[in-house]
Amino acid sequence: MFYPEPVSKLIDGFMKLPGIGPKTAGRLAFFVLNMKEDDVLDLAKALVNAKRQLHYCSVCNNITDLDPCHICRDKRRDGSIICVVQEPRDVVAMEKTREFEGYYHVLHGAISPMDGIGPEDIRIPDLLKRLGDEQVKEVILATNPNIEGEATAMYISRLIKPFGIRVTRIAHGLPVGGDLEYADEVTLTKALEGRRDL
């Protein structure tokens, strides 16, 4: 179907988002076109500001507008525990439980040979450097409970063993094949409480 060029470009822009196909992109485009101009400008500003102002924390690799991030700045947290997660949104999911009081390390991915992602492509070297510099006694591996997450957890646990640091894996109160960001607080709390040594 023919759309004017600005509409086609808007649809193409929405299709670049994960999980958005042509039909959904079209619905979103027409929704935006029907919004008040001030609301559209606010949305556009929010997108541009997020892109310009956010970066990765130099300590944990979480997304932040400060460096270090607010979690790494918080001296009330337990510096002896680091929870390793795959993505920044997983930090948010863990924080919602209000159960974890240590620090985080965000990998920005998982080992996935089928997708051409090896250990050198995610933030594992940064984690090992932190373990050498800080007084860490336990690393909780909270990668997703799928093949890539499990492979990443096993790989990291082998690298950490020589440090003499306790390595635990969150319990599988989470569905296999699921993502942390979609788990509710109770499920994540149970998963944290039931973590096990690797």
UniProtKB/Swiss-Prot annotation:
GO molecular function: DNA binding; zinc ion binding
SUPFAM superfamilies in the record: Recombination protein RecR (SSF111304)
Pfam families assigned: RecR_C, RecR_HhH, RecR_ZnF, Toprim_4
Zinc finger intervals, C4-type: 57-72
Stored CDD domains: TOPRIM_recR (cd01025)
HAMAP family reported for this sequence: RecR (MF_00017)
Protein name (Swiss-Prot/TrEMBL): Recombination protein RecR
Organism name: Brevibacillus brevis (strain 47 / JCM 6285 / NBRC 100599)
